[in-house]
From Swiss-Prot:
Protein name: Bile acid CoA-transferase BaiF
Organism: Clostridium scindens (strain JCM 10418 / VPI 12708)
Key words, A-Z: Bile acid catabolism, Hydrolase, Lipid degradation, Lipid metabolism, Steroid metabolism, Transferase
GO cellular component: cytoplasm
pH-dependent activity: Optimum pH is between pH 6.0 and 7.0 or the hydrolysis of choloyl-CoA. No activity is detected below pH 4.0 or above pH 9.0.
Catalytic site: 168 (nucleophile)
Biological or metabolic pathway of the protein: Lipid metabolism; bile acid biosynthesis
Family per record: Belongs to the CoA-transferase III family.
Transferase recorded as keyword: yes
Sample GO molecular function, one term: choloyl-CoA hydrolase activity
Positions in coiled-coil regions: none
Job of this protein: Functions in the bile acid 7alpha-dehydroxylation pathway, which forms secondary bile acids via the 7alpha-dehydroxylation of primary bile acids, and is carried out by intestinal anaerobic bacteria. Acts as a bile acid CoA transferase with broad bile acid substrate specificity. Catalyzes the transfer of the CoA moiety of secondary bile acid-CoA compounds to primary bile acids. Can use lithocholoyl-CoA, deoxycholoyl-CoA and allodeoxycholoyl-CoA as bile acid CoA donors and cholate, allocholate, chenodeoxycholate, ursodeoxycholate, and beta-muricholate as bile acid CoA acceptors.
Catalytic activity: lithocholoyl-CoA + cholate = choloyl-CoA + lithocholate; deoxycholoyl-CoA + cholate = choloyl-CoA + deoxycholate; allodeoxycholoyl-CoA + cholate = allodeoxycholate + choloyl-CoA; allocholate + deoxycholoyl-CoA = allocholoyl-CoA + deoxycholate
This protein's encoding gene: baiF
Entry's induction text: Induced by bile acids.
Length: 426
């Protein structure tokens, strides 16, 4: 257990205070990433509605370094606890159906009466404004992928959902910078700010130029699977031994180095298809098809290791497709600490992804695993001025709640679904 005052000082965001009342991935990921950078993050949940991600493998990674507070904001006492934390926080982030907190009587204006300078971040599937029939709709990852149009760009004959949870995670990353931008605005203006993050818009924003291409010129690119829909020599290729490798032979200097390898003339040496300064071409054109055929002939005559070695020797971007075991065993992954180990209150000693974005002067840390449901209630409430008698009363009234490890294991059947915990129980 830990309280607000127990949070260690480290990282680029030491001292930043965040209240996160979101659930699943799209909202909480933002707070989780900032907690790794040293922000003090309290994950706030309702006593009867634990975060849906609890009990899944991703929870220990997305919620490490956080504190857990559980209270019923629909009750008078629980609402007071929530507003006390609003008063404490620099940023409040929530994820729910559009307008959910307005319906609870906790509009932005009410929040700013309590803390005039707080940065408010609303995360939802469809946004807080727009067509009323959309705003209150529920959304999961696949909904965001489908509604954004992004899913239609992938696959071959049928649209393809990208795993795992691309829409959720892109929205979470968008939420992360929205939180910081909103907070910086409060610093620059001295006034609170609120930002509306819609899951589908976060994913639509990374469609590159596809929407401009279609909305402006009526051109809709076909689904091409692992082949790039536009650029030639920017795809996965099957080699002589049946193994697959990605090769990206685009850009003027790369084409100069790479074309002789696959039997094409160096740009600028007389072939009209490849003039001086040639950087690449559209895959669906005659020139693009000529380039593709040359590459396919080359890889059909060489093993994947041979292709990889030659491409790397000439500084041509390439990469064989790694399985997870390849990631774990790769020397570069190991050297950067991309994989690390830590202790988690729910799952015990685990191995997973380490800290990304390596800060030189203010490094990030993992100082604790993801807390159990309500694990830090008592310490947080004491930091807010509650005494033991009052805290006991809140528990008796069901306004606050918590699960110990045994309750957690039974509720989520962890001894059945998590292999290393099953062995532990046996």
């Amino acid at each position: 257990m830990a309280g607000i005052k127990d949070f260690p000082k480290f990282g680029a965001l030491a001292g930043l205070k965040i209240l996160d009342s979101g659930s699943n991935i799209a909202g909480p990921l933002g707070g989780g990433l900032l907690a790794e950078c040293g922000a003090t993050v309290i994950h706030f949940e309702g006593p009867k509605k634990p975060d849906n991600q609890r009990g899944w493998y991703g929870y220990p990674q997305n919620h490490r370094n956080q504190l857990s507070m559980v209270a019923d904001i629909k009750s008078e006492e629980g609402r007071k606890i929530f507003l006390d934390l609003i008063k404490w926080a620099d940023i409040w982030v929530e994820s729910s159906k559009g307008g959910q907190y307005d319906r609870l009587g906790l509009s932005d204006e009410v929040i700013w009466e309590v803390n005039p300078k707080i940065a408010i971040v609303h995360v939802s599937g469809y946004g807080q404004t727009g067509d009323p029939s959309y705003v209150t709709r529920a959304s999961y990852d696949a909904v965001g992928q489908a509604f954004s149009g992004y899913m239609s760009l992938n696959g071959t004959t049928e649209a393809l959902k990208i795993n795992p949870y691309l829409s959720d995670f892109v929205c979470g990353l968008t939420t992360c910078w929205a939180m910081l931008a909103c907070y910086v605005s409060t610093i620059l203006t001295g006034k609170g700010e609120s930002v509306d993050v819609a899951q589908y818009e976060a994913l639509a924003r990374i469609m590159d130029g596809r929407m401009i291409q279609y909305a402006t010129d009526g051109v809709k690119m076909p689904r091409t699977g692992n082949k790039d829909a536009q650029a030639a020599l920017f795809s996965f290729y099957t080699c002589k031994d049946g193994r697959t490798i990605f090769i990206g032979m685009t850009g003027a200097e790369v084409c100069k180095r790479g074309f002789p390898i696959i039997g094409l003339p160096v740009p600028g040496t007389g072939d009209p298809d490849f003039p001086e300064g040639f950087t690449g071409w559209m895959i669906y054109t005659p020139v693009g098809q000529r380039m593709e055929k040359a590459m396919e002939k080359y890889v059909s005559e060489h093993t994947m290791e041979e292709v990889e070695a030659e491409m790397q020797a000439h500084q041509i971007p390439c990469q064989r497709v790694y399985e997870l075991e390849d990631c774990l065993n790769d020397p570069h992954w190991k050297a950067r600490g991309t994989i690390t180990e830590w202790d988690d209150p729910m799952m015990g000693h685990i191995t997973g992804l380490g800290l990304i974005n390596k800060f030189k002067r203010n490094p990030s840390e993992i100082w604790r695993g993801a807390p159990l449901f309500g694990m830090d209630n008592r310490d947080i409430l004491k930091d807010l001025g509650y005494d033991d008698a009052k805290i006991d009363e809140l528990y008796e009234q069901g306004i606050v709640n918590e699960f110990d490890l045994d309750t957690t294991i039974k509720r989520y059947r962890l001894d059945e679904v998590i292999p290393h915990m099953r062995k532990k129980e046996e």
